[in-house]
């Protein structure tokens, strides 16, 4: 069971950021109620200072907007926060009685058996297509990738190298944590993590067509995949 201090403090966010350095979710290998517990404990979106928390927060926010989260999880404790219960997830807030009464009055004026207009048919088709697309996206697998990126020499500006790497943006690609690793003779290489949607991003293609060609190859000599794990 994971445990965190107050997540609205710098120390709490730092611990959560370290926890998510090598994880996509709070516990397990899919989004669960543990993620919702931590998500709701945050009073506001994390700043970009906490790279891993920001990546996780945006991912969970997107999941909640699209399809929700149903996995049970293995348990998490957040200081000052209560665990998410079945009732909290399943029970919507009660509607205002006045609003409900007004809606019921409005319903009396609606012709429930009128013919469907062309606009209504088109809207229904668009909704069906949207549901189908979101279902397909939900089923698509994801992978966590650790890449090893080497500069040309010790004079290469590693800050600009990382900026050039992160400038690659595409649907299904999410950059994560990074660090500089000494190689020798004053040279350092970049280790950087990313999460990809398998159906949308090919790491091999990205390396061949973007990371090792102009203008990024001004800084990058070579790029290798150190670890590739299905999520």
From Swiss-Prot:
Keywords: Acetylation, Elongation factor, Protein biosynthesis. SMART domains: EF1_GNE. Residues 82-136 are annotated as: Disordered. Pfam families: EF1_GNE. GO terms for cellular component: eukaryotic translation elongation factor 1 complex; mitochondrion. InterPro entries: eEF-1beta-like_sf (IPR036219), EF1B_bsu/dsu (IPR049720), EF1B_bsu/dsu_GNE (IPR014038), Glutathione-S-Trfase_C_sf (IPR036282), Transl_elong_EF1B/ribsomal_bS6 (IPR014717), Transl_elong_EF1B_B/D_CS (IPR001326). The keyword DNA-binding does not apply. It comes from the Eukaryota. One of its GO terms (molecular function) is translation elongation factor activity. The keyword Protein biosynthesis applies. PROSITE patterns: EF1BD_1, EF1BD_2. Residues 119-129 have a biased composition (Basic and acidic residues). EF-1-beta and EF-1-delta stimulate the exchange of GDP bound to EF-1-alpha to GTP. Belongs to the EF-1-beta/EF-1-delta family. EF-1 is composed of 4 subunits: alpha, beta (1B-alpha=beta'), delta (1B-beta), and gamma (1B-gamma). PANTHER family: EF-HAND AND COILED-COIL DOMAIN-CONTAINING FAMILY MEMBER (PTHR11595), ELONGATION FACTOR 1-BETA (PTHR11595:SF21). This is Elongation factor 1-delta 2. It comes from Arabidopsis thaliana.
